[in-house]
A protein has these predicted regions:
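Short solvent-exposed coil/turn linkers within tandem alpha-helical repeat scaffolds
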Residues: 6, 47-55, 69, 84-91, ...
Length: 187
C-alpha cells in the first residue's frame, strides 16, 4: 500500500498546492478547472485522486470555488463530499460553508442543522468546550434563518443560548446579541 498510495498522495498534494495558488488569488474558474497547461483544477484532483487526503481537500476547495462563482448546486455537491476532520478551524468552517450553501438552494432546515453542527464541531476543539470566535457566529446565522422562517420563539431561545454560552465572544461583549433578542421578543 505504501508504494502505491504514497506517490499518489504526493502527486495529488502537489496538484492541490498549484490549484490553491489560483484560489488564493481569487481566480476561482482556474482553481476549479485548471489552467490548461501546468495546473490541474480542484474538480479533476477530487476525481482523479479519490480516496486521498488531497482529494478530500480538493472537494472542499471545489465547493468553495463554486460558491464564489454563485453556482450553489455544484457548491453543495462538492461540499457534501468533503469529510471534516477534528480540527479547530478548517472543518468547522467547511461545515459552515455547506450550511450557507444550503441557504442558497433554499434548504433552510438543512442549513440550520449544518450551522449548528459547525458550532458544535468548533466547540469540541475550543477551550473548555467553547469556541468564542466561530461558534457564536455560526449559531447567530442559524438563529437568523430560523427567525426568517417565522419561528421567533425558537430563534429567541437560540439568541439567549448564544448570550449564555459564549459570554466571552465579541457578539456578547459588545451587547450586539441583545439587539437580536429584542427583535425576536418583539415579534
Amino acid at each position: 500500500k505504501y508504494f502505491i498510495g504514497q506517490p499518489r498522495e504526493e502527486k495529488a498534494s502537489t496538484a492541490l498546492a498549484m490549484a490553491t495558488q489560483y484560489f488564493d488569488q481569487e481566480i476561482f474558474d482556474k482553481a476549479l478547472n485548471g489552467d490548461g497547461s501546468t495546473t490541474t483544477g480542484f474538480a479533476r484532483i477530487a476525481s482523479d485522486y479519490s480516496g486521498t487526503d488531497a482529494a478530500n481537500l480538493a472537494n472542499l476547495y471545489a465547493g468553495l470555488c463554486y460558491a464564489n462563482l454563485n453556482k450553489w448546486d455544484k457548491a453543495v455537491e462538492y461540499l457534501e463530499k468533503y469529510s471534516p476532520a477534528d480540527d479547530a478551524l478548517v472543518s468547522p468552517a467547511a461545515v459552515e460553508a455547506l450550511g450557507n450553501a444550503y441557504v442558497h438552494v433554499n434548504q433552510l432546515d438543512k442549513a440550520v442543522s449544518y450551522l449548528k453542527k459547525a458550532a458544535k464541531k468548533a466547540d469540541a476543539e475550543g477551550h473548555n468546550g467553547v469556541n468564542n470566535s466561530l461558534s457564536p457566529v455560526f449559531m447567530l446565522q442559524a438563529a437568523e434563518i430560523v427567525e426568517s422562517q417565522g419561528k421567533a420563539d425558537e430563534a429567541l431561545e437560540m439568541y439567549k443560548d448564544i448570550k449564555e454560552k459564549y459570554v466571552a465572544s465579541q457578539l456578547v461583549q459588545s451587547q450586539e446579541i441583545d439587539k437580536y433578542i429584542e427583535r425576536a421578543q418583539d415579534k
